[in-house]
Amino acid sequence: MKQLGLLIRLIIGIIAGILIGMCGQWFGIADTAFFVTIIRLLATFTSLFSTFLSFMIPLIILSFITVGMAELGKKANRLFGLTLLLAYGTTVISGLLTFFIGKAVLPGLIQPITGDVLESNAFEPLFTITVDPIFGVMTALVFAFVLGIGMANLKGDSLLNVFRDLQKIVTGVLSRIIIPLIPIHIAGLFANIAAEGRLAATVKMFASLYAIIIVLQLLYILSQFGLASIVCRKNHFKSMKNAAPAYFTALGTQSSASTIPIALNCAYNNNINSDVADFVVPLCATINLNGDTICLVLGSMGIMLASGMNPTFAMFTPFVFMLGVTMVAAPGVPGGGVMSALGLITSMLGFTDPMQQLIIALHFSQDSFGTATNVTGDQAIALIVDKVDRSASEK
């Protein structure tokens, strides 16, 4: 099973969960003790997993954002500042544009799910365990920013190395426990939804969001190369052809970091100065997560609409700006975007545990396309930085 890609395992989990949940209706055993016990066992696993995930979220935020902010601060130079500004700016713009498009399109496609599937829990867990997080999400964010900025201005790396070790521990928990168990977690979620008879509405919501997200990601790639063409005063849409290998590699790896060698070769083929490419491409693999931003903003809006909530501009504007900071500091690894942003989604948008499970499922299911959007956008940013660097050198 581990040899299968994460996307394949996730699809298997969704299908298995649906099949298990539908058995009650298909075979007329919905009210039997055996079927109810199976669903409640899955609900128990989902509950325990959610509790553990809630415990880990502040640690994920603290470790990744603290180290990310500190390391970015220590790299400060002219090219770094420009690259960081472009990455953050395009992330915020992608989030805001996605919000406006979502407000125009989603209400006509997604209706509140009857019976509020996102809150109901007809099949209670057999037992629950309460594990309180070490501190709250916003506390973790503020603490991470203070420590990160502070360590960036320290001469020594002693404290930074402590948090690097913490990051390694958290990364190990993510890669060896949380991410491998996500398919089982999602299977339990969909089994519960199917057993409650609300599968059709949920699948319709997922299909609508999935299609719109991918279209928006592709359009945003075009817009980034359009911006590069304007800034560089040269038609860089042709450069997209050279960037294609990075896009398709990322579809398979689901990791911006793992795609760096291919992305560098693409940058060289686009005649980007090697010094600029060697600096910008690896940096953007960590700080430029536009594809994740589009998914998280639109996915959150869709899930809120399905649960009867109203995603407002006043609610999403601060969320998008905070999400931009979080995405800049998030790791370029599978699931890094949603895991880093989950705290914001919970605290600023009011997501409940079932809603969190759905945004995790949606994000992981399209993570390949989101990552491909990220690495292709990196090429456009590299083109702009290269143009600015050449112009500055000529002066």
PLM features: residue spans?
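Short amphipathic alpha-helical coupling elements at transmembrane boundaries
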Residues: 40-51, 161-176, 242-249, 265-269, ...
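Juxtamembrane helix-boundary/capping and inter-helix hinge elements in multi-pass membrane proteins
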Residues: 69-78, 152-157, 165, 196, ...
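Signature of multi-pass transmembrane helix bundles
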Residues: 1-12, 16-26, 30-34, 38, ...
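Alpha-helical transmembrane segments of polytopic integral membrane proteins
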Residues: 17, 58-66, 94, 98, ...
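Helix-loop-helix junctions within the multi-pass membrane cores of secondary transporters/permeases
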Residues: 245-327, 381, 389-395
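Transmembrane alpha-helical segments and their short flanking loops
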Residues: 297-395
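The feature identifies polytopic integral membrane transport proteins across all domains of life
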Residues: 45, 80-84, 113, 235-251, ...
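Hydrophobic transmembrane alpha-helical segments of multi-pass transport and channel proteins
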Residues: 52, 88, 92-96, 214-218, ...
